[in-house]
A protein has these predicted regions:
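Solvent-exposed beta-strand/loop surfaces, strongest in extracytoplasmic domains of secreted
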Residues: 1-218
Length: 218
């Protein structure tokens, strides 16, 4: 019942065979392959001779474990006042060996993204960098990709709201020679990013601070 052979003899190694080739078939899915490992021979020392033994071989299981892969959401940007659709291809893949290449030609094509506090669609979100705003919640792949074969880790990304370009143009104003004037602080036009005069979110520029460059107003 013990593991000690007589006369100090030792079985040092055994010849093993993966019955269905799971050991070298890199596309074998994650799971336990029962009785996959078969012993086909042995080598010993200290006087061991196989002919002196009635050797019985019992099979063993081969387990394929998940492969660790990290998906990192890339930083995305939008303009203040505009909603956006998050780009589901804006992510990076880091495989177990440190590169971006998955085994067997498998590919992760897109990821499901979520803006944690809704900055992607809340047009009143102020300009700035919203750290860790973009979260990955899932993925879709091709070329045989199956999420069950991977231990997937998700890393969040930032969402940046950039300033909105708006042009304020001072209108022509007039005065009579000999009279000073007060410049009309409502005499201007607004040109928004999209070409009209309407700012987002119902915002309004009511007045502007005006200056007569050479003092002609006075």
């Amino acid at each position: 019942g013990d593991s000690v052979l007589p006369n100090g003899e030792v079985v040092d190694t055994v010849a093993l065979n993966s019955v269905t080739g799971v050991d070298v078939t890199t596309a074998s899915n994650v799971g336990t392959y029962a009785d996959e490992i078969a012993i086909t021979g042995q080598a010993g020392s200290n006087g061991f001779s196989a002919g002196n033994y009635d050797l019985s071989y019992e099979t063993g299981d081969l387990v394929v474990n998940q492969r660790a892969v990290t998906l990192t959401a890339s930083q995305q940007e939008r303009i203040y006042g505009d909603a956006m659709v998050l780009d589901d291809t804006a992510f990076t893949v880091t495989d177990l060996d440190g590169d971006a290449v998955l085994p067997n030609g498998e590919v992760i094509d897109t990821v499901a993204l979520n803006s944690a506090t809704g900055v992607d669609v809340v047009t009143t979100s102020n300009v700035g960098t919203y750290a860790d705003e973009i979260a990955i919640t899932g993925q879709a792949g091709s070329n045989g990709f199956s999420a069950g074969n991977y231990d997937l880790s998700y890393v969040t990304g930032d969402l940046v709201v950039n300033q909105r370009a708006v042009t304020l143009t001072a209108l022509q104003q007039e005065r009579i020679y000999g009279n000073a004037m007060v410049l009309d602080d409502t005499a201007f036009t607004v040109t928004d990013l999209d070409g009209d005069s309407v700012l987002p979110n119902g915002e309004v520029i009511d007045t502007v601070a005006l200056n007569s460059v050479t003092g002609i107003d006075a």
